[in-house]
Amino acid sequence: MEPIIEIENFSAYYGEKIAVKNVTMKIFKNQITAIIGPSGCGKTTLLRSINRMNDHLPGFRVEGKIYFKGQDIYDPQLDVTEYRKRVGMVFQKPTPFPMSIYDNVAFGPRIHGVKSKHILDRIVEESLKKAALWDEVKSELNKSGTRLSGGQQQRLCIARALAVEPEVILLDEPTSALDPIATQRIEKLLEELSENYTIVIVTHNIGQAIRIADYIAFMYRGELIEYGPTREIVERPKNRLTEEYLTGKIG
C-alpha cells in the first residue's frame, strides 16, 4: 500500500515542554487513520503539525521529518499556503465563516484565484454534494452558514475543505460537539470520502475509531505506543498500555 504521509523520528515542543516524542509512522493513501489516546497525549499536536498549524505559536519547534508525497513539509522552501490546499483541516468546533453558505464554500477557491461565477457555482455544488449537504441547503445558499445546525455546520466545514481539492483531510475531534445522529452522518460521510481522499482523524471516541478507521495509532504521554490495522490493534494489541486504554483502565 502506498504511503502519502511519512513521519520519521518526529518530536514537537512548546518551549521546553515536549508534546510529541520521536514518532515514526506511515499514513496510507485512501485509508482512514484514527489517532487515539487520553487528553494531553500529543495527538492533536501531531495532527496540527502535519498541517503546519502550530508554526506561529510562541516557542513551538519541531525535530525530525514529516514527508508529504516525498516532500519535507518543514523545508523552508515549501509554499505553506499551497501545501495546505493539498492537506486540509477540519476543527473540533464547527467554524463556519459569518457569511453565506455559498461564500463559505467559495472562499478557498477565490483565494486561490478562481473568479468565474460558473466555475464557482460548480465547485460549490460539487463540494456540498460530496459533504452530503447539498440537498438540505440547495434552495438557501444565501443563508448564513452560522444559522445551520451543528451537524450541518460541520458538514459545511468539510465542504469548505473539499472545495480546494485536497488529497488529505485532517479532522480534530470533528464530532465531539455533535449529537449521536449528526455524529453518525459524519462517520458515514468520512467512510464515503475515503474512496477519494486520505482521512486522518483525532478522536477520544474509541468506538468511533473502531467503526470507521482502517488504521489506529495509539498515543500516550507524547509517544506512539502502537500503530497498525484496526482489527489487529483491537483484537491483538501488542502493548499492555494499548489494551488498558481500549478496555477503559487508563484514560
UniProtKB/Swiss-Prot annotation:
Sequence ranges assigned to domain ABC transporter in this UniProt record: 5-246
The protein's Enzyme Commission number: 7.3.2.1
Keyword annotations: ATP-binding, Cell inner membrane, Cell membrane, Membrane, Nucleotide-binding, Phosphate transport, Translocase, Transport
Gene this chain is encoded by: pstB
Biological process according to GO: phosphate ion transmembrane transport
Single GO MF annotation: ATPase-coupled phosphate ion transmembrane transporter activity
Family: Belongs to the ABC transporter superfamily. Phosphate importer (TC 3.A.1.7) family.
InterPro entries assigned to the protein according to its UniProt record, in alphabetical order: AAA+_ATPase, ABC_transporter-like_ATP-bd, ABC_transporter-like_CS, P-loop_NTPase, PstB-like
Function statement: Part of the ABC transporter complex PstSACB involved in phosphate import. Responsible for energy coupling to the transport system.
Matches recorded under PROSITE patterns: ABC_TRANSPORTER_1, ABC_TRANSPORTER_2, PSTB
Keyword Ribosomal protein: no
Membrane topology per record: Peripheral membrane protein
Keyword presence, Transcription: no
A GO CC term attached to the entry: plasma membrane
Organism: Thermotoga maritima (strain ATCC 43589 / DSM 3109 / JCM 10099 / NBRC 100826 / MSB8)
Subcellular location: Cell inner membrane
Origin: domain of life: Bacteria
Record-linked CDD domains: ABC_PstB_phosphate_transporter (cd03260)
Protein name per its UniProtKB record: Phosphate import ATP-binding protein PstB
SUPFAM superfamilies: P-loop containing nucleoside triphosphate hydrolases
Subunit structure: The complex is composed of two ATP-binding proteins (PstB), two transmembrane proteins (PstC and PstA) and a solute-binding protein (PstS).
Catalytic activity: phosphate(out) + ATP + H2O = ADP + 2 phosphate(in) + H(+)
